[in-house]
Amino acid sequence: MKKVLFYVLPFAFFGCSATVDPQISMKPPAYVEELAPKQSNNVESAPGSLFGKGDNPLFSDKKAMNVNDLVTVVIQESTTQSTQANKATSRTNTSNLGGGALTGSSGVVANALNKVNAYSNIGFQTNSSNKYTGTGSQSRNESFNTTISTRVIKILSNGNYFIEGSRELLINGEKQIIQLSGVIRPYDIGQDNTIDSKYIADAKILYKTEGEVDRSTRKPWGSKVIEAIWPF
């Protein structure tokens, strides 16, 4: 019994390792961490001036300009995929070995054996064929639309912003989690302080649900283990 468990347990652990759900890391890209932040310009207002240059100047866009400012991201992501593959292979092999099965070196023996072979007519013949035909097709159409407010985490030395934000909703026992991070240009931010997700570089968008409905749609772990180790 111990020997059986010794051989079975590695496959079980292998099956469990293959059932890990895909994850996404919201950690900033390496170049964002390596680049130094942009130095802030501390501008002092001129005494008696009507038009200051502080955080709330009279003439300026109401857009994110500093660290911790908010930017609203309009997520409009759609993906369409269509794949089709066909494969066919065949192989035929024929081997035919005629003549007698008995041979001799000397003349007298060879003549005698040739007479025996003439009556026996022993030979070998093999035929083999192999044919494989396979086809596959896949079609997917996905879309995801929502809005989320993000925060300017870092202003890079070239003026671009690294933004990050998250949102959690709990509705009827179902928890919805949305997370987003990426790099944007301040020039792509609209006058209403919004930006489309298509303008985000190195975008990472995570959407997942937690609750009874999510658990009911998942395969039991036992089924996942069997599918992972089943060789056929």
Curated annotation (Swiss-Prot):
It is found in: Cell outer membrane; Bacterial flagellum basal body. GO terms for cellular component: bacterial-type flagellum basal body, distal rod, L ring; cell outer membrane. GO terms for biological process: bacterial-type flagellum-dependent cell motility. The keyword Ubl conjugation does not apply. A lipid is attached at C16 (N-palmitoyl cysteine). Residues 1-15 form the signal peptide. Pfam families: FlgH. It is a lipid-anchor. A lipid is attached at C16 (S-diacylglycerol cysteine). One of its GO terms (molecular function) is cytoskeletal motor activity. Keywords: Bacterial flagellum, Cell outer membrane, Lipoprotein, Membrane, Palmitate, Signal. InterPro entries: Flag_Lring. The keyword Lipoprotein applies. The basal body constitutes a major portion of the flagellar organelle and consists of four rings (L,P,S, and M) mounted on a central rod. Belongs to the FlgH family. PANTHER family: FLAGELLAR L-RING PROTEIN. HAMAP family: FlgH (MF_00415). Assembles around the rod to form the L-ring and probably protects the motor/basal body from shearing forces during rotation. This is Flagellar L-ring protein. The lineage of its organism: Bacteria, Pseudomonadati, Campylobacterota, Epsilonproteobacteria, Campylobacterales. The gene is flgH.
